Amino acid sequence: MSLATTNSVAEIRARNKELIEEVLKVYPEKTAKRRAKHLNVHQAGKSDCGVKSNIKSIPGVMTIRGCAYAGSKGVVWGPIKDMVHISHGPVGCGQYSWGSRRNYYVGTTGIDSFVTLQFTSDFQEKDIVFGGDKKLDKILDEIQELFPLNNGITIQSECPVGLIGDDIEAVSRAKSKEYGGKTIVPVRCEGFRGVSQSLGHHIANDAVRDWIFGHIEAEGKPKFEPTPYDVAIIGDYNIGGDAWSSRILLEEMGLRVIAQWSGDGSLAELEATPKAKLNILHCYRSMNYISRHMEEKFGIPWCEYNFFGPSKIADSLRRIAGYFDDKIKEGAERVIEKYQPLVDAVIAKYRPRLEGKTVMLYVGGLRPRHVIGAYEDLGMDVIGTGYEFGHNDDYQRTAQHYVKDSTLIYDDVNGYEFERFVEKLQPDLVGSGIKEKYVFQKMSVPFRQMHSWDYSGPYHGYDGFAIFARDMDMAVNSPIWKRTKAPWKEAPSAKLQAAE
């Protein structure tokens, strides 16, 4: 049993505050003062977690954040399957992020779907000196010739494009006209913009607003027959099939899903979304901007949902149903009742094996709070959590609805801090990303990737909860931990004792 579960709330709070002070001692005074604003111990009743967020990382620290290009191309636009997404700039940005997110989709790759292909303009020195617009023009022609069934193209700008002032908007307009009105979207997501991938999400949302919705209004399309029960899934990237498992529940309760943004999504679905009666928002951080725009422009309400774990699934189904008539409300209750035997079986099997185990999380802009309920459904206790690129409203939601008193909170935590926190709090499981995975596994700490589900999933929905429970049990109770132990679980060697 971890040390964190053996003390009172007051003792845990005091210990966590001491831990923060201890971690900050290694920094120069100015750096320590800045980092102190990002670390805190949550106090019950507070409206937020008491940390600063969405601020530039300190130069020289090993931040775990990404850039605006990653937020736009890697998160929002990349999963749109029937569009070609050009990484416009040097080859490295696209190459080293190629296929790193498991955005499942239906289609024939290279024919009518292009998610897992890497398109790059491969900038060279001469392109920096003389500009890359002519090269971009040629690339667009090549794409049209080689992939004639693509339904649109996005141009995802990398850093040099913004620095040299290329006019990708003019190229996009000219080529769109040349191709008979084809959708070509320039996205100014150069990596130097903003403080993290979060601004890339915002820029991508704005590109949808200006280059997709703007053209729909002007051209009077799409032609779409609405029903009273049309909804759009917003901010689900179909990691491991998450959006599909969510869609099943929505359709079983009587709703019609007319669009998925953007996992397994298409250009036609983006264009159809202004006809929805409700936008249901999964990843608030990356897609709240376009959801708010559609509410203001088209009068479409939106609500957040959380399909991690049965408790949150039931809450979300009822919240969504509240926007519709009794038919949908009855459908929600029917779905909850249908899956209750599955939930009972999963909890009966895995909760005894996971009860009381402690977890520390550090993920992107949503999962540090959304997955907490699923862990609690299994009897596990989240003792620390934080966001790579969360904003203040994310920490408000976390404080008001998810974390317990005395939980350790860390914003934009760096490699050093996270390792020290784990060493001191000694969790039974860490959930974070690929960069952290092997560090903690080498420390003999059970670990699960909470960005890509460690090549498992889906984790959304009732079926996903069964997979989630199995994977957490597999990580925590693997036989390998009988052969290797975390440093704090090993008896000190005679040599170390002599040295002391």
Swiss-Prot record:
Organism: Bradyrhizobium diazoefficiens (strain JCM 10833 / BCRC 13528 / IAM 13628 / NBRC 14792 / USDA 110)
Keywords of this entry: ATP-binding, Iron, Iron-sulfur, Metal-binding, Molybdenum, Nitrogen fixation, Nucleotide-binding, Oxidoreductase
CC terms in the record's Gene Ontology section: molybdenum-iron nitrogenase complex
Stated name of the protein: Nitrogenase molybdenum-iron protein alpha chain
InterPro entries xrefs: Nase/OxRdtase_comp1 (IPR000510), Nase_comp1_asu (IPR010143), Nase_comp1_CS (IPR000318), Nase_Mo-Fe_asu (IPR005972)
Quaternary structure, from the entry: Tetramer of two alpha and two beta chains. Forms complex with the iron protein (nitrogenase component 2).
Summary of the function given for this chain in its UniProt record: This molybdenum-iron protein is part of the nitrogenase complex that catalyzes the key enzymatic reactions in nitrogen fixation.
Encoding gene (name): nifD
Co-factor requirement: [8Fe-7S] cluster; [7Fe-Mo-9S-C-homocitryl] cluster
Keyword Metal-binding listed: yes
Reaction catalysed by this enzyme: N2 + 8 reduced [2Fe-2S]-[ferredoxin] + 16 ATP + 16 H2O = H2 + 8 oxidized [2Fe-2S]-[ferredoxin] + 2 NH4(+) + 16 ADP + 16 phosphate + 6 H(+)
Residues at which [8Fe-7S] cluster binds: 67, 93, 159
Pfam families: Oxidored_nitro
UniProt binding sites for [7Fe-Mo-9S-C-homocitryl] cluster: 283, 451
Catalytic activity, EC: 1.18.6.1
Gene Ontology MF, one: nitrogenase activity
Family per record: Belongs to the NifD/NifK/NifE/NifN family.
Phylogenetic lineage: Bacteria, Pseudomonadati, Pseudomonadota, Alphaproteobacteria, Hyphomicrobiales
Cofactor stoichiometry and binding remark: Binds 1 [8Fe-7S] cluster per heterodimer.
NCBIfam families: N2-ase-Ialpha, nifD
GO BP: any one term: nitrogen fixation
